[in-house]
Design a protein with these regions (language model features):
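A compositional/biophysical signature of low hydrophobicity enriched in polar/charged and small residues
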Residues: 1-159
Length: 159
């Protein structure tokens, strides 16, 4: 089943199997209702889907300049825990790094989701580049208490 609202899918290894980005063409009257209908009415009814977790950011920042060719992009997703009341500051701070193309303030288990984008290449591999920016830069931000990084095995992005 193809869903027009699915903009990206990322194959992961670990606690989650797939991370998908959903978007609506027009601004819906009540986006939560449309999202609920999409997730419960279609995605959860797909064969082989056992469970879903839906993350809806309270606030987002994005960088306009993505790499030109989607087939050359590789991603890493960094879930960030911040000190009490510092989530928005951390969300803004991580946007200072060139590799961070999106930063989302979350309500729930993690405080911020940072999306890192790299040009594909094997030397050094993407997980190594992600580890370097996370451990040497992002995790050293004083208001961050913990990070969890997910590096997709494969990504499909609609343009």
């Amino acid at each position: 089943m193809k869903l027009a609202q699915v903009r990206e899918t990322h194959l992961l290894a670990g606690e989650w199997d797939i991370l998908a980005t959903l978007a609506f063409e027009e601004e819906p009257v009540d986006p939560r209702e449309r999202l609920l209908d999409l997730v419960t009415g279609k995605i959860r009814k797909m064969p082989f889907v056992r469970d879903t977790n839906t993350i809806v950011p309270a606030m987002s920042r994005t960088r306009e300049a993505h790499l030109a060719h989607p087939e050359r992009r590789a991603y890493a997703f960094v879930f960030i825990d911040a000190k009490m009341g510092k989530g928005q500051e951390v969300m803004n701070h991580v946007m200072r790094y060139d590799e961070v193309v999106e930063s989302h303030l979350l309500l729930g288990k993690s405080d911020v989701l940072a999306v890192l984008e790299f040009e594909k290449g094997i030397i050094p591999p993407v997980p190594e580049r992600a580890a370097k920016i996370v451990t040497e830069e992002i995790a050293k931000i004083s208001d961050i208490t913990n990070t969890e990084t997910l590096c997709p095995i494969r990504s499909i992005v609609k343009d």
